[in-house]
Amino acid sequence: MAQISKYKRVVLKLSGEALAGEKGFGINPVIIKSVAEQVAEVAKMDCEIAVIVGGGNIWRGKTGSDLGMDRGTADYMGMLATVMNALALQDSLEQLDCDTRVLTSIEMKQVAEPYIRRRAIRHLEKKRVVIFAAGIGNPYFSTDTTAALRAAEVEADVILMGKNNVDGVYSADPKVNKDAVKYEHLTHIQMLQEGLQVMDSTASSFCMDNNIPLTVFSIMEEGNIKRAVMGEKIGTLITK
């Protein structure tokens, strides 16, 4: 019998760095396998799951821009990096017999389906794992903003933000400030006013305007994705 989750449909946001593990660069097969196993476990429950992956383990558009590259070109390179991560995750999921589709905002029909909202929803209804890649298809927008937009479009109940270096939202960097306090609950407006670096302000404002809750948690602890889907109190919950 399938376990009952708190949410019917979720968007899982993974940073590219989370897929690199301690190496900090590239794709760590052990991490990908662990994430895939956790996602596959959730997919077997009564919960529909979409995944959005960043590309910072391969390329960061802002870094290229800071070094003098054209910002648009640098951002498009970052979008391609997210596709590489998405294909790696898809392969790992399919090795676990988990039906998966990659949908990209930039057409590349040889490797993935183009993003169409109704098609994405249909895949989710058929209990397929959907991986969104290539951001929103436009430069100057982060994958955090992609997560917020796609969550609204597919009417997800929550965005689960899996982090690799922190287990929630703190008042300051806990690695630098030993007096940093971990928040169990925040509002979107608090997050914006206090400048807490959970996601960029565009994404945060979008979540606030569209009443999309977030759960920020550590992806590095085995089983945390399932715990988040079950509604267990892990990490930090951010609501309107």
From Swiss-Prot:
UniProt subcellular location: Cytoplasm
Gene3D superfamilies in the cross-refs: Acetylglutamate kinase-like
Record's keyword terms, sorted: Allosteric enzyme, ATP-binding, Cytoplasm, Kinase, Nucleotide-binding, Pyrimidine biosynthesis, Transferase
Reactions mediated catalytically: UMP + ATP = UDP + ADP
Pathway(s) per entry: Pyrimidine metabolism; CTP biosynthesis via de novo pathway; UDP from UMP (UMPK route): step 1/1
UniProt activity-regulation remark: Allosterically activated by GTP. Probably inhibited by UTP.
GO cellular component: cytoplasm
Any one of the GO BP annotations: 'de novo' CTP biosynthetic process
CDD domains given in the database record: AAK_UMPK-PyrH-Ec
Pfam families according to UniProt: AA_kinase (PF00696)
Family: Belongs to the UMP kinase family.
NCBIfam families found in the cross-reference section: pyrH_bact
General function of this protein: Catalyzes the reversible phosphorylation of UMP to UDP.
Subunit structure and binding partners: Homohexamer.
Protein name: Uridylate kinase
Provenance organism: Staphylococcus aureus (strain NCTC 8325 / PS 47)
Origin organism lineage: Bacteria, Bacillati, Bacillota, Bacilli, Bacillales
